Amino acid sequence: MRKRLIAALLIMLLCMGMSMTAYAVPQITPEEQPPAEATEEEAQAFKAAQLKKYYDMPVATNEIKGWPQGPGTYGEAAIIMEAGTGAILYGKNIDDQHYPASITKVLTALVALENGKMDDKVTFTHDCVSFLQPGDSSIGMKENDEITLEQALYATLLASANEAAYAVAENVGTNAGHDYQWFIDQMNARCKELGGTNSNFVNANGLHDENHYTSARDMALIGKELFKHPEFFKIVQTLQYEIPSSGTCQQHV
C-alpha cells in the first residue's frame, strides 16, 4: 500500500507543472487579460480574480458519491493517478488541452530511455543551440560540445535545459538511423500507445507553439509508464549534478 501511495504522489508531482502554469488551447482571449491601460494594482487584482476563477472550477472526482473530497487548485487542470492501476484519484478538467511548456521533457526522457543507451554520445549541432533566445532555460552548451545521453538527460530534467532536450532528440533519432523529426513522431506515437487522446507534440523541449499541447490525463499516462525506468527517478531525485569538463565540453553544474 505504501508503495502504491508513493507512486500516486509521484504521478501527481509529474503533472504539477501543468496544473500550476499551463494555458488552455484555444488561446487566451482579450477579455481574459488585464486591459492594456491597467495600472499595476489593477493588473494584480485582475490576475487574482483569474486565479480565483480557476480555484472555483469544479473538481470532477468530488462529484462521485462517497469519494473523498479533494481541494481546489489554482490551475485549470490537475490529476492524481495511482500508478499501479491507472485509477484516477483526483481529477479536474483532465482532458482539456493545455500548453505543457517544460513538462514536455518528461515525454522526451521516456522516448530517449526507450530508444537510447545512457552511455551514448550526444553531440550538440548548430540546430541544438541556434534557436535559444534570451531568457530560455539553458546550461550554456555550445556547438560541437559532446556529452553522454545520461548527462544530457540530467541537464534536461534538472536544469530544464532546452538545448539539451533538443540534442537528446536529435542524437537519439540519428542513432536510430533517422533524425530529429523521427524522435518527435515517436513522442506522439508513444503518447497515443499509452492511451493519450488529447496531445500533439511538435518539439522536444516544450518551447511555445500553438500546435504543441497535451492534457493532464495524457501526461499522467506518460508518467505512469516511466515507472518502468528507475534511472528516470534516480535523475529527478538528484539535488545537484555536475557535468565535468573534458576535451569535448566545459564543466556544467
What residue spans do the PLM features occupy?
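Active-site-adjacent loops and short helices of periplasmic peptidoglycan-processing enzymes
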Residues: 25-217, 221, 226-227
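Extracytoplasmic
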Residues: 218, 223-253
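Intrinsically disordered, low-complexity segments enriched in small/polar residues
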Residues: 15, 64, 68-70, 245, ...
